[in-house]
A protein has these predicted regions:
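Contiguous segments within soluble domain cores/interaction surfaces
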Residues: 1-101
């Protein structure tokens, strides 16, 4: 079993190229393990940057999805534009940065 040390839990970051982060009204990060939703975080849980949204996982969350998991984000802007992205990836203790077109 992998040991996760304090301060080494991953941050999942989405970088937006064509959407102003300040215009995002709703965002949901979902991490699925198999067919089950293991973690769900909202915009209020996010660290908001100029062109990024980031979510930091706790040690318990990281252990619950360690290995292959599907990471998804869905968002809606204040103008009603919707978008989403999903990717199956290996989640370890490093940081993960994904670009959203």
């Amino acid at each position: 079993m992998a040991e996760i040390l304090n301060g080494t839990t991953p941050t999942i970051t989405y970088k937006f190229k064509h959407v102003e982060v300040s215009d995002i009204a709703t965002a949901i990060l979902t991490i699925k393990k198999g067919h089950n939703i293991a973690i769900e975080k909202t915009l209020s849980d996010a660290i908001v940057g100029e062109d990024t949204l980031s979510w930091r996982l706790t040690q318990a969350q990281t252990l619950s999805v360690l290995g292959s998991a599907e990471v998804m984000i869905n968002w809606v802007t204040t103008g009603g534009i919707r978008g989403g992205s999903n990717k199956t990836m290996l989640l370890f203790t490093g940081n993960h940065i994904m670009e959203v077109i």
